[in-house]
Amino acid sequence: DRSSAASDVYKRQTLDILREMKYYQNAWTNQYDIWFSIYSTPSESLTDRFCRLDKERFGEIPDITDKGYYQNSFHYDVRKDVTPFEKLDFEKDYPYYASGGFIHYCEYPKLNHNIKALEAVWDYSYDKVGYLGTNIPIDHCYKCDYDGDFETTENGYKCPNCGNSDPKTVDVVKRTCGYLGNPVQRPVIEGRQKEICARVKHMKEPRS
């Protein structure tokens, strides 16, 4: 369910789970005198693997196993058409329990024309989150000199201007986990590619 009410319910449930995990983290730290922590993992393979295993066991469940991937960490559903502010408001309560590491990010179109929009998000996030990534398209085609956002499919990437998809003459950069990667030169696992395909921008393209 992708409704706002359902999101609130699931958020409360997942925060309850994290509080329980935090309790054991602290207990084990005191018991063994070794620091334990909760890491909001961007595990590349588990995005794909856990979904496949659950589909084999439980079948195809709408909005869960039918997507072909699981959402990383505490990130808001990448399919949701929300603003950067709404996304950060949803995620901001989770890092308190994730002392081992976390990241927030928002997806944008090219914003060369509107730097103040980015600054507004950064200002808003300043006292709400501890680590914020800004995903702006910087893909480049060396065949037609296009700069921007390549078309993303489950089979790869191509220049929207000339259709070029030759790995030797394109440069594509995507946030594949907590890091930036080039999925043309180093293809990602199938579930991750499906997740990238499902992403929506959290800010709209300007009207021409």
Where are these regions (language model features)?
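Short acidic, low-complexity intrinsically disordered linear motifs used
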Residues: 168-183
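Cysteine-rich micro-motifs
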Residues: 153-164
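Secondary-structure transition/capping motifs at alpha-helix termini
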Residues: 19-35
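Well-ordered, non-membrane alpha-helical segments in soluble/globular domains
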Residues: 11-24, 115-124
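Short functional micro-motifs and their immediate structural scaffolds
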Residues: 149-150, 166-168
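Catalytic alpha/beta core of large soluble enzyme barrels
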Residues: 36, 42-151, 173
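Long, highly charged low-complexity segments enriched in Glu/Asp and Lys/Arg with interspersed Ser/Thr
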Residues: 130-131, 137, 189-208
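Single conserved hydrophobic/aromatic residue that forms the stacking wall/gate
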Residues: 1-6, 10-13
